[in-house]
Swiss-Prot record:
Binding annotation for Mg(2+): D588, D592
The protein's name: ATPase 1, plasma membrane-type
Keywords: Acetylation, ATP-binding, Cell membrane, Hydrogen ion transport, Ion transport, Magnesium, Membrane, Metal-binding, Nucleotide-binding, Phosphoprotein, Translocase, Transmembrane, Transmembrane helix, Transport
Complexes and interactors: Binds to 14-3-3 proteins. The binding is induced by phosphorylation of Thr-948. Binding to 14-3-3 proteins activates the H(+)-ATPase. Interacts with PPI1; this interaction promotes ATPase activity. Interacts with PSY1R. Part of a functional complex containing PSKR1, BAK1, CNGC17, and AHA. Interacts with CNGC17 and PSKR1. Triggered by SAUR9 via the phosphorylation of the C-terminal autoinhibitory domain. Interacts with AHA2. Binds to CBC1 and CBC2.
Membrane topology (UniProt): Multi-pass membrane protein
Taxonomic lineage: Eukaryota, Viridiplantae, Streptophyta, Embryophyta, Tracheophyta
Length: 949
């Protein structure tokens, strides 16, 4: 093993020496290693993965106390012991201990939840760990790349991320994308004997290689070792910071006003002033916000993984909630990717060849192992799959690649003659065979006929190789025939597309097939037939019919794109993003990686290549579109919970700051900082349960509308502050409650007033969560059981404190059950108007309030003739639509998009086109039924009531 230690210490240059010497130095053969040798070597070289930085658990725990919101609380704790002295009173130890407890509780919950989420994510990501084909014990098997050691023989094919530094063995040259390592944008050709680096992607070809370096000893490992990972501040973090800053600024304004009024104007005692400032600091900071939001996201991410969508980036959840356009691959996502060939429709273009021979040639030009869907269909059409290699000796197989779009087999027949067969895209095979114009015309006409029936075409050609070498170009190619391929739609695709449109997500089909096939599939799936060949939109030869319309608008209105190349996918995403859409893109191949990276949500479908998975944000573990739509719904529910909480947090900051500030300044009443601390602890304990609350997801794409969050928070918080001020005034300055409810007066007893205000603030503050969590009336939408139980327990504790407490240090005394009942009645009565305020804010912010006030009221308008011409035009257009003179879909073509409500109009228009396509199909069916009935002499009227259109 001393030789292997030299290799580990890099004293032997395995990159330059001849390949045979590599085997000698590594003490291995072309037959690979045994399992035992692999285990022995992993002890020497270590696992084939980069070293992960070990994070100190204690530092991670303390990290949850190191953010702007925590700093404010920590400042309050220091104030409680450092500044809160004077009047011969000791420092405020109760508040200090209470604040520290609150910080520790929050950090503990955050730490535990993040740890659990991290462990769950690690377990899920382990399932996505790079796999590789390795030769061990003389057998090829798929193993995790982490087990590789120098000396292993691996197989590299199109779409693979190369798992370790290796030297290529015999075979065709590889095209490798090294851009992740070297920044070279173009793929590099690597010949047998040359080195390939870990982390680069195979773009073309297939070959075996011997591993020479793994883990931290690879080129990639050394580079990663030198570069420290940079922490990019995500959108979610920016939103969190904005909300935190808003709350801190609100508190700062309140504190500034209190300091100016209390000391220079009112000449209050120093210690009383400090206590009032502590009330604002402790009560106003939403200390639980980072915890609640990260826990909500972690729980949501786990739920998504149970539905078959693994989130690689946690914040992809919020983007998924806002997604309004989904570009979906046709093959495998909208269809089953289970191809079949109708033998009767096979077309032969070569004399002396039967249809069965065309099928045999196609099967010969296919893999018999490690097959893709087309290979499996071709070989599966034979009576016995072994026929694909019967009586011939395989010399060389050219695998499929996105450039040539074909496969080929060079073989020797039983007579010793060399031949080559190829199957692939008809255009490529026609060019290969240098087809005459008349043959080309016949073939293209045949392809169009197939396409009208939704069938894809596969062409087959053959040639003789007189030179008898695999490298020789061979004789002229002969175009043999065309095969029709049928890929049936998934049984749930049509229903899922309908659901997506109802959710405001416009699904656009992306297919490499012809336009006619795309339209036929779109018609079958009920998604409309407004499709374009991507070359006509994005290529150099743009269609003259649509040249006058902006490309962005055409892409936005399209139901799908045909003849799509990977580079077109990137352009489609880019153009949609320029129109302010949140775009999701599905992909599976190595060439989809740029588009997946560019999209707001890159979705790697089930069985995607390593390269596609690496570039995506979400990896699906199950096939089909329904997984994506379920993930959209779940993401919106998660996002809704987060939004509900942020509105609540902003409202509470406003109500605490301005409510207690007004009470302190108008009546010079000093509320106890300790009682605010009790409110904060009970509130935070309850609010943690919102991460599992039952919510109604938004019916349209959703996003962080900070204007709406702040406006709602200010109005609801302001309303609650005013209600508390009115309650205090009524209890302190009037006998209203004594006269109306028969309770004893507490107007001159400050300690009992403290208990009464505490209970009123506690109830209405915590009940606010039911207003912010609902889209309609809060008493109609049932909350989750956990939230309800937590609320009841918290308010029971708050009521018992208010009724029985006798804490001299907190200046609070029990008020009895009579007052508690009165406060509950007051809180319930003042609770209901909050729903009305919530609806009013939403209506005003939507812009419709101003539009109806100014644009449609002639007294306020500035339009010529009071806008009579515009109103007449609107009426005429409505009448034309009503009487069928103008199709409904032509009305309201893409206004300026200012809101998600307008953005979802693209989905509404797609829905209308889909309905027209469906009715057209039914209309065709009805005509067909009537003609058959006439031929058969049936009574159509009796048959008519069996179906409706």
């Amino acid at each position: 093993m001393s030789g292997l230690e030299d290799i580990k210490n890099e004293t032997v240059d395995l990159e330059k020496i001849p390949i045979e010497e590599v085997f000698q130095q590594l003490k291995c053969t072309r037959e690979g290693l045994t399992t035992q040798e692999g285990e022995d070597r992993i002890v020497i070289f270590g696992p084939n993965k980069l070293e992960e930085k070990k994070e100190s658990k204690i530092l991670k725990f303390l990290g949850f106390m190191w953010n702007p919101l925590s700093w404010v609380m920590e400042a309050a704790a220091l104030m409680a012991i450092a500044l809160a002295n004077g009047d011969n009173r000791p420092p405020d130890w109760q508040d200090f201990v209470g604040i520290i407890c609150l910080l520790v509780i929050n950090s503990t919950i955050s730490f535990i939840e993040e740890n659990n989420a991290g462990n769950a994510a690690a377990a899920l990501m382990a399932g996505l760990a790079p796999k590789t084909k390795v030769l061990r014990d003389g057998k090829w098997s798929e193993q995790e790349a982490a087990i590789l050691v120098p000396g292993d023989i691996v197989s590299i094919k199109l779409g693979d991320i190369i798992p370790a530094d290796a030297r290529l063995l015999e075979g065709d040259p590889l095209k490798v994308d090294q851009s992740a390592l070297t920044g070279e944008s173009l793929p590099v050709t690597k010949h047998p004997g040359q080195e390939v680096f870990s982390g680069s992607t195979c773009k073309q070809g297939e070959i075996e290689a011997v591993v020479i370096a793994t883990g931290v000893h690879t080129f990639f490992g050394k580079a990663a070792h030198l570069v420290d990972s940079t922490n990019q501040v995500g959108h979610f973090q920016k939103v969190l910071t904005s909300i935190g800053n808003f709350c801190i600024c609100s508190i700062a304004i309140g504190i500034a006003i209190e300091i100016v009024v209390m000391y220079p104007i009112q000449h209050r005692k120093y210690r009383d002033g400090i206590d009032n400032l502590l009330v604002l600091l402790i009560g106003g900071i939403p200390i639980a916000m980072p915890t609640v939001l990260s826990v909500t996201m972690a729980i949501g991410s786990h739920r998504l993984s149970q539905q078959g969508a693994i989130t690689k980036r946690m914040t992809a959840i919020e983007e998924m909630a806002g997604m309004d356009v989904l570009c979906s691959d046709k093959t495998g996502t909208l269809t089953l990717n289970k191809l079949s060939v109708d033998k009767n429709l096979v077309e032969v273009f070569c004399k002396g060849v039967e249809k069965d021979q065309v099928l045999l040639f196609a099967a010969m030009a296919s893999r018999v192992e490690n097959q893709d869907a087309i290979d499996a269909a071709m070989v599966g059409m034979l009576a016995d799959p072994k026929e694909a290699r019967a009586g011939i000796r395989e010399v060389h197989f050219l695998p499929f690649n996105p450039v040539d779009k074909r496969t080929a087999l060079t073989y020797i027949d039983s007579d010793g003659n060399w031949h080559r067969v190829s199957k692939g895209a008809p255009e490529q095979i026609l060019d290969l065979a240098n087809a005459r114009p008349d043959l080309r015309k016949k073939v293209l006409s045949c392809i169009d006929k197939y396409a009208e029936r939704g069938l894809r075409s596969l062409a087959v050609a053959r040639q003789v190789v007189p030179e008898k070498t695999k490298e020789s170009p061979g004789g002229p190619w002969e175009f043999v025939g065309l095969l029709p391929l049928f890929d049936p739609p998934r049984h749930d695709s049509a229903e899922t597309i309908r659901r997506a449109l109802n959710l405001g997500v416009n699904v656009k089909m992306i297919t490499g097939d012809q336009l006619a096939i795309g339209k036929e599939t779109g018609r079958r799936l009920g998604m409309g037939t407004n499709m374009y060949p991507s070359a006509a939109l994005l290529g150099t030869d743009k269609d003259s019919n649509i040249a006058s319309i902006p490309v962005e608008e055409l892409i936005e209105k399209a139901d799908g794109f045909a003849g799509v190349f990977p580079e077109h996918k990137y352009e489609i995403v880019k153009k949609l993003q320029e129109r302010k859409h949140i775009v999701g893109m599905t992909g599976d191949g190595v060439n989809d990686a740029p588009a997946l990276k560019k999209a707001d949500i890159g979705i790697a479908v089930a069985d995607a290549t390593d390269a596609a998975r690496g570039a995506s944000d979400i990896v699906l573990t199950e096939p089909g579109l329904s997984v994506i739509i379920s993930a959209v719904l779940t993401s919106r529910a998660i996002f809704q919970r987060m939004k509900n909480y942020t509105i609540y947090a902003v409202s509470i900051t406003i109500r605490i700051v301005f409510g207690f500030m007004l009470i302190a300044l108008i009546w010079e009443f000093d509320f106890s900082a300790f009682m605010v601390l009790i409110i904060a602890i009970l509130n935070d304990g309850t609010i943690m349960t919102i991460s599992k609350d039952r919510v109604k997801p938004s019916p349209t794409p959703d996003s962080w509308k900070l204007k709406e969050i702040f406006a709602t928070g200010i109005v609801l918080g302001g309303y609650q502050a005013i209600m508390s001020v009115i309650f205090f005034w009524a209890a302190h300055k009037t006998d209203f409650f004594s006269d109306k409810f028969g309770v004893r007066s507490i107007r001159d007893n400050n300690d009992e007033l403290m208990g009464a205000v505490y209970l009123q603030v506690s109830i209405i503050s915590q009940a606010l969560i039911f207003v912010t969590r609902s889209r309609s009336w809060s008493f109609v939408e049932r909350p989750g059981a956990l939230l309800m139980i937590a609320f009841v327990i918290a308010q029971l504790v708050a009521t018992l404190i208010a009724v029985y407490a006798d804490w001299t240090f907190a200046k609070v005394k029990g008020i009895g059950w009579g007052w508690a009942g009165v406060i509950w009645i007051y809180s319930i009565v003042t609770y209901f108007p909050q729903d009305i305020l919530k609806f009013a804010i939403r209506y005003i912010l939507s812009g419709k309030a101003w539009a109806s006030l100014f644009d449609n009221r002639t007294a306020f308008t500035t339009k010529k003739d009071y806008g009579i011409g515009e109103r007449e035009a609107q009426w005429a257009q409505a009448q034309r639509t009503l009487h069928g003179l103008q199709p409904k879909e032509d009305v309201n073509i893409f206004p300026e998009k200012g809101s998600y409500r307008e953005l979802s109009e693209i989905a509404e228009q797609a829905k209308r086109r889909a309905e027209i396509a469906r009715l057209r199909e039914l209309h065709t069916l009805k005509g067909h039924v009537e003609s058959v009935a006439k031929l058969k002499g049936l009574d159509i009227d009796t048959a008519g009531h069996h179906y409706t259109v």
